[in-house]
Amino acid sequence: MSRRKQGKPQHLSKREFSPEPLEAILTDDEPDHGPLGAPEGDHDLLTCGQCQMNFPLGDILIFIEHKRKQCNGSLCLEKGVDKPPSPSPIEMKKASNPVEVGIQVTPEDDDCLSTSSRGICPKQEHIADKLLHWRGLSSPRSAHGALIPTPGMSAEYAPQGICKDEPSSYTCTTCKQPFTSAWFLLQHAQNTHGLRIYLESEHGSPLTPRVGIPSGLGAECPSQPPLHGIHIADNNPFNLLRIPGSVSREASGLAEGRFPPTPPLFSPPPRHHLDPHRIERLGAEEMALATHHPSAFDRVLRLNPMAMEPPAMDFSRRLRELAGNTSSPPLSPGRPSPMQRLLQPFQPGSKPPFLATPPLPPLQSAPPPSQPPVKSKSCEFCGKTFKFQSNLVVHRRSHTGEKPYKCNLCDHACTQASKLKRHMKTHMHKSSPMTVKSDDGLSTASSPEPGTSDLVGSASSALKSVVAKFKSENDPNLIPENGDEEEEEDDEEEEEEEEEEEEELTESERVDYGFGLSLEAARHHENSSRGAVVGVGDEGRALPDVMQGMVLSSMQHFSEAFHQVLGEKHKRSHLAEAEGHRDTCDEDSVAGESDRIDDGTVNGRGCSPGESASGGLSKKLLLGSPSSLSPFSKRIKLEKEFDLPPAAMPNTENVYSQWLAGYAASRQLKDPFLTFGDSRQSPFASSSEHSSENGSLRFSTPPGELDGGISGRSGTGSGGSTPHISGPGPGRPSSKEGRRSDTCEYCGKVFKNCSNLTVHRRSHTGERPYKCELCNYACAQSSKLTRHMKTHGQVGKDVYKCEICKMPFSVYSTLEKHMKKWHSDRVLNNDIKTE
């Protein structure tokens, strides 16, 4: 379009090639064309050059029809600036005659024609030129970059009757083929003769104005601005994004006010982009040359015209990507050029680059899969998806067999820290002592913090757990049941525990490690303090050795209870010298007094050889063999050479009963060192309230075992040592006020309701009334059975059946574990039946 269509007045630039001064022309034009120009800032009017009629910019089609048929003005024939010397007589024919269109022009005319293409001189506007704009085309140019001389483009080619009507036909000068329209001629010239005149729109409307990329080489035409002439250095990487059509358009369009002066480096080109498929066909040498020589890259792009692309590619991101690279490295055969990397389209699954930031390294815990998974949190083995990456890491260990979490007290290993935490409760019975550093550098038990009383108990609970561990190892009937229960619980709770967060896992690791460290440090200190390894044949030191092994001698309650028990033993064994020895049995002589006890006496009483053997058993309860005392390596093992009689098994709990009674007695004598505000904060706070009239604890005195003998749960030793428990005593509530029916008679734990106590009591008795009908699973709680039944199948989900025992499973990994556990001798087939 001319500048008059944009509402701009005529302004002639200073040119050197005009043979006559232009001032006279300007003075003649200004009075005639005074009303042509719209206001300087108005851009929405089109003015006819002949009749001075204004048209809105939206009515450009009406303006074109006006120029074709209705405008009969004579101004277009009078003012002819920059004419050639004289038109030939052949060119003076009427417009109704056929017109031949030349495709080649001489280099002398190239300068003038290219200058006139910028809309400075001509007074006529050719209909074919308007049709090119109407169909989304730019003005055609020849192979040398000049405009193709279409009929009536300027006054020198059709001086008569151009504004009246369009020529009847157009003839190609190369093949002499006539055409009825200039548009058909342009299509013929581009498709048949290979001239690159315009760009075809794939998705746009024909009425959408497009800016075409001229195909001529711009080096020969001095009027065309160079590629890198818009204030950009030659070695700037942003020159790679400069397109010849856009540069020439910006250079001329910005100067004429057609386009808003937006910064070219941070706004995408309006309507057309680079075609990545054509750029990839360019050679590496051409791309390297284009990096350093933008004019050569201009030739490459013009020789390889590019089809239009939908405006979906974000150039601003690619500009930021190139922001840090000011120079291009030398090209190698295996490495794509910078331009190829720039123009490579974004992949659908890839993340677009931003500021050339390198991608983060992958997680160390997740092995890289052979093929990128569809979802980042899906298992590459079975395809199961997870919410959190930590759950995927834990689940992947079920396929790889990795078990990074190992118990410090036994050889148990698991895949989750929460499972290790649950396993540690079998050692601790849900009461692990918090460990702190004492003055001598050893880990000792400290008072629990508020709010942690349910999880943190006293060291005597750990003592009982070791006793129970010893019983389970020596009783063959308990081993399969406990082992199966633990493994079945692992299987049934796997799916629920996969939803736990990493913070909980980290916290549980820290607590479990502290508990294991305290027990191992106690074992190590027990061996180093003696100076010699305890042999298998050493017996008769059960109580002092337990004190040293569990680091209980430094705790005030256990130390006082220990003194009382030793004092009672001393009184019974030496009746004649009871008072004298009681004064000398102070803290310094406790270990020596325990060493002077005969091998045939336990707790100050005579006993049979079988009973002495059981007394020696209590000594071996926590000490273990010398080979198992290396820190953080093996479990606390008992000597296999020591054969335990079946009748002596219940005697192992006598030690625990005595300690429990002594602890309760010491709490009532004086203010305790560990102050508990509520009776529920200590497992032993209400144990003294369950006392019978003879002073013995209820749970430690079954019927028929009060009259002598160490076998069973005898509490005579503890009853004799605590004669004051029968009365309320100072600071102790009465038995009616303090007694509660929801207190466990085995460990003294207090519950809010009786149903919880009933379930808890089954952990001591081993009762499991809820059994699965499909497998041998049994549990003490109905909710656990309900959760377990979900592992066998749920409504609306696939069920995987074992081919051997036909047991159903809802998760395939659970079936794999079942096959490894029960049918490890058979190979698991891949074609598992699903229903």
Curated annotation (Swiss-Prot):
Biological processes annotated in GO: B cell differentiation; gene expression; negative regulation of gene expression; negative regulation of transcription by RNA polymerase II; protein sumoylation; T cell differentiation
Positions bound to Zn(2+) 1: 48, 51, 66, 71
Chain positions found as Phosphoserine: 86, 205, 332, 337, 446-447, 608, 625, 630
Binding site for Zn(2+) 3: 772, 775, 788, 792
Basic residues bias (residue ranges): 1-12, 421-430
Required for nuclear body formation and for SUMO1 recruitment: annotated segments: 1-210
Compartments where found: Cytoplasm; Nucleus
Compositional bias ranges of the Acidic residues kind: 482-506
UniProt-recorded name of the protein: BCL11 transcription factor A
Gene that encodes the chain: Bcl11a
